[in-house]
Amino acid sequence: MYDSTYDTRKHINRVGLYLAIFQGFLSNRADLHDASKLLPPEKETFDRVTPLLNDLTYGSDEYKETLASMQGALQHHYANNRHHPEHFEHGINDMNLIDVLEMLCDWKAASERHSDGDIYKSLEINRKRFGISDQLYQILKNTVDML
């Protein structure tokens, strides 16, 4: 009679291997996240503008105007950081799950810098901004609930 124990353990080990690979990718992203902000041409702009952004409501007209003043640094930042939808020609549709998870963690941490920050409001704003599908939006919301 067939005993599934061996095949099941083999499968469990294989899944564990793949999860460990993703764990390595996530660890690398954590180490390198936004490192480009620490060097020219981004650092000078972020030194000047970040304190202003922290006092503004995310997504407000004033926030958008302030971002517009950073375009050179932002373009460099987006080009060098694939957790931003702007990095890709087709935005989020070109991202992988590691990119999306880093993006979500970035949005959560950024929302905490604003005096009136709220990750759920940020998700709503970014849902419209980046054309996030209902299904992905719900997955992002479910994931934020874990933090």
Question: Model regions: which residues?
Answer:
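Metal-dependent phosphohydrolase cores
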Residues: 1-147
